[in-house]
Regions:
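DNA-contacting interfaces and partner/effector-binding or oligomerization modules
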Residues: 2-66
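Amphipathic alpha-helical dimerization/coiled-coil segments
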Residues: 2-10, 27, 31, 80-131, ...
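Amphipathic alpha-helical segments enriched in hydrophobic/aromatic and basic residues
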Residues: 26, 37, 64, 75-76, ...
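Residues that mark the N-terminal boundary/hinge immediately upstream of a DNA-recognition element
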Residues: 35-37, 121, 135-137
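A short acidic, leucine-rich amphipathic alpha-helix
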Residues: 40-42, 138-142
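Short amphipathic alpha-helical interaction segments
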Residues: 47-60, 144-159
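A short, conserved structural fragment
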Residues: 60-68, 158-168
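Short, Lys/Arg-rich nucleic-acid/phosphate-binding segment
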Residues: 69-75, 81, 167-175
Length: 256
């Protein structure tokens, strides 16, 4: 079972943001920091007072929002919790993103991204894929789950734009970690991998630096060598197959 499960703080932080109403509340705080009361936020977004209060307190508990009390009123702000540096960086990234020109459907995009990080088994899968492409059985072992559960988590990671797959031969597929493009995804991935590295000094992520064609050739090399496709440490390979790799792909293999 992965050590990721021993530190659930981060996936719980993501769970607090995997909700459209909570994201809209966060955006409202960004735009009206320290000026609106809980009741004013509730009216602004068409929420019940107690629902808005619960959502704001949940984000405060995860270090995403600060709070200031004046008599009977409570005002939320973007003051950072220094004891939770990862939450502080995520808060800053999310606030910067929301101050920009948001595209249509931004709430749905962010919910899908955060849902990719809302379970410790998904973080275990991410940590495993950062070390190299993997088969479904390898991801099952990394997450400590059965096939059905692993597929369930992979669906969320795929929807989040974090994971993809490609075929290598008849009836065989490998999963890989995609290069992140969304600023929030970049921060989330870095935090997950930084936590894994802090627990294991031998951990060596090699985040997706190969295109699909190069990945297929690399998998073929591994099959020819009689080792698993994800054994990046073994650098023998066959001359004929290796010539089909681009210079960038060859460097990626040697640096792994």
């Amino acid at each position: 079972m992965s050590d990721v499960k021993l530190k659930p703080t981060y996936w719980r932080t993501c769970r607090a943001l995997a909700n459209e109403d909570r994201l809209r509340l966060f955006k409202a705080v960004v735009e009206n920091e320290g000026r609106f009361s809980v009741r004013q936020y509730a009216r602004l977004l068409g929420l019940q007072d107690d629902v808005a209060s619960v959502y704001l307190r949940q984000m405060n508990a995860r270090g995403l929002l600060g709070v200031k009390r004046e008599h009977i009123k409570v005002f939320y702000n973007l003051n950072r919790d220094r004891s939770l540096p990862q939450a502080a960086e995520l808060q800053q990234t999310l606030a910067t993103y929301m101050r920009g020109n948001l595209p249509a459907g931004w709430e749905d995009t962010l919910v899908r991204i955060f849902k990719g990080f809302t379970h410790f088994n998904r973080l275990a899968i991410i940590a495993r894929l950062a070390k190299g492409d993997a088969t479904l059985p390898e991801l099952e072992r990394a997450a400590g789950t059965i096939v059905k559960s692993t597929y369930h988590h992979l669906r969320f990671l795929y929807a989040a734009g974090v994971v993809d797959t490609y075929r290598v031969g008849r009836g065989s597929s490998l999963y890989f970690l995609k290069e992140p493009t969304h600023p929030v995804t970049k921060v989330l991935l870095r935090h997950v991998l930084d936590e894994e590295y802090s627990r294991n000094s031998n951990y060596n992520p090699v985040v997706g630096c190969l295109d699909k064609a190069s990945r297929i050739v690399l998998a073929k090399i591994r099959r020819e060598e009689g080792v698993t496709p994800t054994n990046w440490k073994n650098r023998r390979g066959t001359g004929v197959s290796r010539k089909k790799l681009s210079p960038k792909a060859q460097r990626a293999m040697l640096e792994a």
